[in-house]
């Protein structure tokens, strides 16, 4: 799971484990979940300086799967990994409240730009209406995990506005602070972690101590005070290695587990629960 190695996510998790800064994870509500993850992706994009050519089957949900059971897998994984670190999560700990799925539409010229093909293959005809390809690549899941309200959503647009790219938005709500990752225009479309305090007294010094305690893993990080209750976490560029490099880190982790001959005790049961969450949400969304 590559996003476990994204530096802002790692620091968000680390700070959520500092009770003097974060407090306890709130129970949340469906409208204001205790933890939420949203990612926006684009079918047409530039990767490593070159236009990405996707195979046509990538747009066939019978072969690729729908969005609600695809990228959401990563987001559900992060919810489990951050909210309940090192804990075994059983399927009985999951309650699906609501879920939905919807399409992204592609015109023939957009399809050609993505795949290089002049026409839709036969296996995509089932999703074509009035010459427009409609793909169920978007999904949203509202659920509880061990009694805490969570929400994950994935959106696939055709193409990002000029100068932007895929984005990630994440919120963890605690009794003492909220930990929020934003990646919008104000952040120059770069993942940025904010800490928003709910308590005034000693919070700043507690935050500084917490950051000092994780310098070994995240050397050079600092807190930039924006207001009396809001800080931006400054992260050295050397720690921002980029999404493609995370695949190497995942591989290193796998090879370590392979050498040791075992995974962490929580990894396999949580993997089962992760896929249970996405598939149950998919089944629920199909009933609408």
PLM regions and their residue ranges:
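C-terminal helical cap and adjacent loop that interface with cofactors, partners, or active-site loops
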Residues: 70, 75-80, 87, 92, ...
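Predominantly a Rossmann-like dinucleotide-binding segment in NAD(P)-dependent oxidoreductases
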Residues: 2-130, 254
């Amino acid at each position: 799971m590559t996003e476990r190695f994204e530096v802002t996510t790692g620091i968000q998790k680390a700070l959520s484990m500092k009770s003097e800064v974060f407090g306890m994870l709130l129970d949340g509500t469906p409208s204001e979940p205790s933890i939420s993850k949203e990612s926006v992706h684009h079918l047409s994009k530039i990767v490593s300086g070159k236009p990405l050519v996707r195979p046509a089957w990538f747009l066939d949900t019978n072969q690729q799967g729908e969005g609600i059971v695809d990228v959401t897998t990563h987001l559900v994984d992060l919810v489990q990994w951050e909210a309940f670190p090192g804990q075994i999560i059983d399927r009985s700990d999951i309650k699906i409240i609501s879920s939905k799925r919807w399409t992204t539409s592609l015109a023939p010229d957009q399809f050609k730009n993505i795949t290089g093909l002049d026409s839709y293959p036969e296996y995509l005809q089932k999703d074509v209406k009035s010459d427009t390809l409609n793909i169920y690549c978007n999904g949203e899941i509202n659920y509880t995990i061990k009694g805490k309200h969570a929400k994950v959503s994935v959106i696939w647009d055709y193409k990002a506005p000029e100068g932007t790219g895929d984005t990630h938005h994440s919120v963890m709500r605690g009794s003492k602070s909220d930990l929020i990752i934003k990646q919008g225009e104000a952040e120059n479309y770069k993942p940025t972690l904010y800490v928003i305090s709910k308590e005034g007294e000693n919070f700043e010094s507690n935050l500084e101590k917490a950051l000092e305690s994780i310098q070994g893993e995240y050397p050079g990080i600092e807190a930039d005070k924006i207001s009396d209750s809001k800080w931006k976490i400054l992260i050295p560029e050397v720690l921002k290695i980029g999404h493609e490099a995370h695949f190497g880190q995942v591989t290193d982790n796998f090879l370590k587990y392979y050498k040791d001959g075992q995974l962490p005790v929580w990894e396999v049961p949580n993997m089962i629960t992760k896929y249970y969450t996405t598939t149950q949400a998919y089944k629920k969304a199909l009933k609408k």
